[in-house]
């Protein structure tokens, strides 16, 4: 009896230690900030710097739009950086759209540590920079890939933008964690990125694109986002996984939607 009681106590202590480690260390897993970083922007882009509300000076890549084209404010995934972001916007760049590629705090040479609130501040700083540069919010398409769907949704909620585009978007981070690790209590997930709860309040048109073979952010996330925003345009791409944003096919779909659905919007 005493042995059983001791085993229960030991198991409880192990669970508490594991929970404490998960709670304190999870941002290292959620925001890995890869080391391969572009030394300089490619032709057509230049480095610009934004100023966040909590005092951080962050680098970003920017290229102006051709006449009559939209500017895409782009938020990359958590395991990516500006190198990957450049690969994800080759199609829009070739089509003449302007691009503001946000780099997060703690990524590359940027100061700070990433978090949900931090990424929202980084996005707000990029939006302010565009406005100060003469790009009206109504000319901005806010786009987010994977976890970048979080700051993209938040910025579209706060601003009167042209459109919101979510590629491989999360319905929420606890939803993704629950599917991957059902034993982890939702309450332990510190950063929420609750996009589904916000979509109905976004005034701009919404475009949702997802791969039907995505095993990281599963299509169940798309269904929850679609349920939250029934009037959204939806593209479910057959055979595509979580690398959807980097494919030429996905970028062609995105450019076609922007050039078609948004062409008549002032």
Feature annotation, model-predicted:
Residues 129-133, 137-183, 198:
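Primarily recognizes the serine-hydrolase "nucleophile elbow" in alpha/beta-hydrolase
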Residues 240-250:
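Catalytic histidine-centered segment of alpha/beta-hydrolase-like enzymes
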Residues 248-266:
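Catalytic active-site module of serine/aspartate enzymes centered on a nucleophile-bearing elbow/loop
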Residues 7-51, 266:
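An N-terminal hydrophobic leader/cap segment in hydrolases
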Residues 53-132, 150, 156:
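Membrane-embedded segments
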Residues 212-217, 242-244:
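Acidic catalytic loop of the alpha/beta-hydrolase fold
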Residues 201-203, 208-210, 214:
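Short beta-strand/loop motif that positions the catalytic acidic residue
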Residues 88, 195, 204, 218-227, ...:
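Short alpha-helix in the alpha/beta-hydrolase fold that links the catalytic acid
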């Amino acid at each position: 009896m005493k042995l059983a009681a001791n085993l229960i106590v030991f198991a409880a202590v192990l669970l508490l230690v594991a929970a404490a480690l998960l709670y304190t260390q999870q941002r290292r897993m959620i925001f890995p900030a890869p080391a391969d970083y572009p030394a300089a922007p490619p032709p057509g882009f230049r480095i610009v710097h934004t100023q966040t509300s909590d005092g951080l000076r962050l680098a970003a890549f920017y290229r102006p739009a051709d006449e009559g084209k939209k500017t895409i404010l782009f938020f990359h995934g958590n395991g990516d950086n500006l190198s990957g972001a450049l690969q994800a916007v080759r199609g829009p760049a070739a089509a003449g759209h302007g691009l503001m590629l946000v780099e997060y705090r703690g990524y590359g040479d940027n100061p700070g540590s990433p978090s949900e609130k931090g990424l929202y501040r980084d996005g707000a700083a990029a939006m302010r920079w565009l406005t100060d540069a003469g790009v009206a919010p109504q000319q901005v398409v806010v786009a987010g890939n994977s976890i970048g769907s979080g700051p993209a949704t938040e910025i579209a909620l706060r601003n009167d933008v042209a459109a919101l585009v979510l590629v491989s978007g999360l319905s929420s981070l606890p939803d993704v964690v629950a599917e991957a690790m059902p034993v982890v209590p939702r309450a332990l997930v510190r950063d929420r990125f609750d996009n589904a709860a916000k979509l109905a309040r976004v005034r701009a048109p919404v475009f949702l694109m997802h791969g039907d073979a995505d095993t990281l952010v599963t299509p169940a996330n798309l269904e929850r986002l679609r349920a939250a925003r029934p009037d959204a345009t939806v593209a479910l791409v057959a055979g595509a996984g979580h690398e959807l944003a980097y494919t030429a096919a996905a970028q062609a779909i995105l450019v076609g939607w922007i050039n078609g659905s948004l062409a008549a919007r002032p």
